[in-house]
Amino acid sequence: MFQGGHQPIMVLNQNTKRESGKKAQLANISASKAVSEIVTSTLGPRSMLKMLLDPMGGIVMTNDGNAILREIDVNHPAAKSMIELARVQDEEVGDGTTSVIIMAGEMMSAAKPFIERDIHPSIIVTAYYRALEESIKKIEELAVPIDVNNDDQVNKALSSCIGTKFTSRWGKLITDLALKAVRTIMRGGNLQKLNLEIKRYAKVEKIPGGTLEDSVVLDGVMFNKDITHPKMRRFIKNPRVILLDCPLEYKKGESMTNLEMMKETDMTDALQQEMEELALMCNDILKHKPDVVITEKGVSDLAQHYLLKQNVSVIRRVRKTDNNRISRVSGATIVNRPEEIQESDVGKKCGLFEVKLIGDEYFTFMTECENPEACSIILRGASKDVLNEMERNLHDCLAVAKNIFVNPKLVPGGGAIEMEVSSHLEKISSSIEGLHQLPFRAVAYALEAIPKTLAQNCGVDVVRNITELRAKHNQEGNKFIGIEGNSGKITDMGEANVWEPIAVKLQVYKTAIESACMLLRIDDVVSGLKKQKVAKGGASVTDGNGQEIPETFGDARDG
């Protein structure tokens, strides 16, 4: 930086790398496009799988956009931002992670010629936001309502989601599992919190072995625990269940406790006191005549002995999340102290308590429950990799089912909605004046990336198919014409039963266009060395390559 012809003043550290203006914007566009090209081949039913080596040396085989991108380590900040998009999409609606990355990359590419021609990013961003508003209006206009009480209609929508996955061969099975699980959770009746409740109360348990057809949704829960004593009952019909969040052990001192014993009877007295205390705790439980006691904390040998004498089965150190699910299926209330237990806290809704040995581990099943509001989804499969991919596919399917129940509207898949919105934007672009018209029209062309990618992954002639598709959408009455993902043929998506939830589609458009706008507004990228703490005694600190890291000044508490 020069000032008045004098010596340059260095404001930034010499190690700092800085890109600004057009150079930074073009670098962001290139990084975004590079990330989107990674997942392009994983879109649609004819998608390819990616094999990734994770940092621990394990292998991940998947075509799930979010699962691929979270395993990839990138340096460019714009690329990191793109990867974050897939995570947000997965968190919000569970599906459409690949589509959102492809579309965001295409939106960035569409802006490149305008940046090169020195059109100000604010003009591009304004046009993009206007195109987003028009797109949302058109999508909502094209949406078709669905009857959520009709399982056939919901299954058709779910099969479109699972049809693009590795487990598409077992599509019917996985859609049935997802639908049954969501209907079980919905008995709680809170649609607004359905997303949170599915994560909390629908637990996927993976057990290697068996075949995929052995997978099932339990009308209850299962967890990986055994009873604490081999003589306790492993099979109980209609058990009375008590759930605790406290240890059944003699209370230990808060800090270091010293006990001074003056005579030989003191030891006996101390042990006697412990036995009486535990007997009192157990009696508080036993007066409610339970069959099963489950606690999140420990159970001492003495407490086990007292409970075993009354034929009570005990399970200890259960996870908090598992205990919450057991509470929902058994009707029991989790109690913090044994003396506070009341008759209304005892669970009576569970029909069968059973501990089974599967492989070399014991699993506890609490099934045949009356109107359970939580469930366990048991997945069986040949190997760990297959089970992990099944779980990812089931997660997407559960999310799509949740979206359908929350917002029961569908839009056509197979790129039909993109082509129809593209055609609509193209028509109204002529009414936009000034420079805004060019980026607005660019959004229309960028939307064609989805049908183009579908055609490309099918191995058909992309140019011919997209030209034909564009011509059909410019005519009236062809709103639902798209590309059939398996054959690459141009088909009516309504007849082919390829549907997507409107919530997923709206989220894809909003996330892709808004993130592209955010990245286009960046005109300066500064990257430098981070602050490092100096080792005690003033010795210099070295990084992983043995290079000395310069000392940093200021108090460590400065943040």
UniProtKB/Swiss-Prot annotation:
Record-stated family: Belongs to the TCP-1 chaperonin family.
Task: Kindly indicate whether the keyword Nucleotide-binding belongs to this entry.
Answer: yes
UniProt keyword tRNA processing, yes or no = no
Taken from the UniProt record, the cysteine pairs bridged by disulfide bonds within this chain are C369-C375
Looking at the record's lineage, which domain of life comes first? Eukaryota
Identify the keywords attached in UniProt to this record, alphabetized.
Answer: ATP-binding, Chaperone, Cytoplasm, Disulfide bond, Nucleotide-binding
Cellular component terms (Gene Ontology): chaperonin-containing T-complex
Which purpose does this protein serve, as stated in its record? Molecular chaperone; assists the folding of proteins upon ATP hydrolysis. Known to play a role, in vitro, in the folding of actin and tubulin.
State the protein's name.
T-complex protein 1 subunit gamma
Q: Which organism is it from?
A: Tetrahymena pyriformis
Pfam families registered for this protein in UniProt: Cpn60_TCP1 (PF00118)
Q: Which proteins does it associate with, and in what oligomeric form?
A: Heterooligomeric complex of about 850 to 900 kDa that forms two stacked rings, 12 to 16 nm in diameter.
Which stretches does the entry tag as region Disordered? 537-559
Q: Which PANTHER family match?
A: CHAPERONIN (PTHR11353)
The protein's GO terms of the molecular function aspect are: ATP binding; ATP hydrolysis activity; ATP-dependent protein folding chaperone; unfolded protein binding
Q: Which Gene3D superfamilies match?
A: GroEL, GroEL-like equatorial domain, TCP-1-like chaperonin intermediate domain
Q: Where in the cell is it found?
A: Cytoplasm
